[in-house]
Amino acid sequence: MTPLKIAIAGANGRMGRVLVEAVNNHPDTVLSGALEHSGSEALGLDAGYAVGLKTGIAISDDVDAVLAQSDVLIDFTRPEPTLKHLQKCVEKQVNIIIGTTGFDDTGKAAIHTAAEKTGIVFAANFSVGVNLTFHILDTVARVLNEGYDIEIIEGHHRHKVDAPSGTALRMGEVIAGALGRDLKQCAVYGREGHTGPRDPSTIGFATVRAGDIVGDHTALFATDGERVEITHKASSRMTFAAGAVRAAVWVNGKTGLYDMQDVLGLNNR
């Protein structure tokens, strides 16, 4: 079997470094390119330098050259560069795995349009455990559909720039969908001052940013006399990186828009 050629965007970032390691660890993949922004101090360095690997791949800012020798790009950067990379992937017929969060509706629409011409796995979280949690939340919300107040609490490291996290928002979307609600209409993001009694139809969000928290997410269903808490805690970014590489292998040869539920076969159950 010919190894799948994977390029990493943001290769010198916290997530990018772990992705380089994950590609190196997978028996069916090989690192074909590593991208960083123009002016990065890492340009020219071996992509594996930060994790003690010698990959033979130099970090570059030449998107066209990197994609020309790749089957798939994994991108966990920020919305603006991801959308630029996405258009290049469409031009070069390269699949893309998108772990970037914080897209507005226009950005999401661009991803949907691009999926008509290339294979895309776009997910708020690539952890197997988190995606199983999404599946569980759908069932729980359908059962606890009356008389329960729903709150979502998430925590991440001090460097995370978007809030709530994409994973927390996806949890909210799953729960709202199971209840027949529109998250845009029922979400409450933080509370301050005299807020009055809680509206039972709302889904609340609370955000923590501190230290080096990799990712903590809890969905709380509370009523008089009991509460149900469903929690996922990530202790290593390798959880997300390994899932992204798994998605890259899975989407090879496919066209269309998929998420991690598709990769794991959970959408067929």
Swiss-Prot record:
UniProt cross-references to CDD domains, sorted A to Z: DHDPR_N
Active site residues per record: 156 (proton donor/acceptor), 160 (proton donor)
SUPFAM superfamilies per the UniProt record, alphabetical: Glyceraldehyde-3-phosphate dehydrogenase-like, C-terminal domain (SSF55347), NAD(P)-binding Rossmann-fold domains (SSF51735)
GO cellular component: cytosol
Catalytic activity: (S)-2,3,4,5-tetrahydrodipicolinate + NAD(+) + H2O = (2S,4S)-4-hydroxy-2,3,4,5-tetrahydrodipicolinate + NADH + H(+); (S)-2,3,4,5-tetrahydrodipicolinate + NADP(+) + H2O = (2S,4S)-4-hydroxy-2,3,4,5-tetrahydrodipicolinate + NADPH + H(+)
GO terms for biological process, alphabetical: diaminopimelate biosynthetic process; lysine biosynthetic process via diaminopimelate
One family name in Pfam for this protein: DapB_C
Subcellular location, principal: cytoplasm
GO MF: 4-hydroxy-tetrahydrodipicolinate reductase; NAD binding; NADP binding; oxidoreductase activity, acting on CH or CH2 groups, NAD or NADP as acceptor
Record's keyword terms, sorted: Amino-acid biosynthesis, Cytoplasm, Diaminopimelate biosynthesis, Lysine biosynthesis, NAD, NADP, Oxidoreductase
Keyword Cell membrane part of the UniProt annotation: no
Stored InterPro entries: DapB_C, DapB_N, DapB_N_CS, DHDPR_bac, NAD(P)-bd_dom_sf
PROSITE patterns referenced in this protein's UniProt entry, alphabetically: DAPB (PS01298)
Name of the top EC class for this enzyme: oxidoreductase
Keyword match S-adenosyl-L-methionine: no
Subcellular location: Cytoplasm
Record-listed (S)-2,3,4,5-tetrahydrodipicolinate binding positions: 157, 166-167
Name recorded for this polypeptide: 4-hydroxy-tetrahydrodipicolinate reductase
Organism phylogeny: Bacteria, Pseudomonadati, Pseudomonadota, Betaproteobacteria, Neisseriales
